[in-house]
């Protein structure tokens, strides 16, 4: 089990009204829990759960259109909001084959992001109806299963 509490702020002249603001690396809470269990000499399983506070982001508060192009309007304060918190569970199981004179093999079955959490990778803002901006969250991965065979000689 690992836990980290960490804050990261920046002050840059001309940004955020010259006031301190959250840096992109400000993720106060990071938790990692890893469990490994060896059922026998030939079979083991593991679980890994990760949680991080969402990354800071600056949301626009309006938009305007000029010559057919739409632009976002920001209030001047940087990183006042956050992405949704990030978390996922990964599972893995490994079966080792019997040792032969010259080599040994093992099968591994893994599942990344077991419960299919849609962790935000990026946020896009698109023009919506009634002169509004719509927020679209982009996700990289959902559940990813894998099977592999490894051998040593």
Question: Which ranges hold each PLM region?
Answer:
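Gram-negative outer-membrane beta-barrel transporters
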Residues: 1-56
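Flexible, solvent-exposed coil segments and beta strand-coil junctions
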Residues: 6-16, 67-75, 126-131
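Transmembrane beta-barrel outer-membrane domains
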Residues: 22-28, 82-86, 138-142
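Extracellular structured ligand-interaction cores
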Residues: 30-32, 90, 106
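Generic detector of contiguous secondary-structure segments
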Residues: 32-33, 73-74, 98
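C-terminal beta-signal and adjacent terminal beta-strands/loops
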Residues: 42, 51-69, 86-88, 95-153
């Amino acid at each position: 089990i690992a836990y980290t509490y960490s804050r990261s702020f920046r002050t840059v002249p001309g940004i955020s009204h010259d006031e301190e603001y959250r840096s992109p690396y400000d993720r106060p809470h990071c938790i990692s829990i890893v469990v490994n269990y060896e059922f026998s000499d030939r079979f083991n399983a593991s679980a890994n759960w990760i949680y991080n506070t969402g990354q800071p982001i600056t949301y626009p508060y309006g938009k305007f259109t000029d010559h057919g192009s739409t632009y976002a309007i920001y209030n001047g304060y940087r990183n006042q909001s956050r992405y949704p918190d990030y978390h996922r569970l990964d599972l893995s199981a490994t079966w080792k084959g019997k040792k032969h004179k010259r080599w040994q093999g093992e099968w591994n079955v893994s599942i990344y992001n077991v419960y299919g959490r849609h962790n935000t990778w990026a946020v896009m803002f698109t023009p919506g109806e009634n002169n509004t901006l719509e927020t679209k969250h982009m996700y990289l991965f959902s559940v990813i299963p894998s099977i592999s065979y490894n051998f040593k000689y």
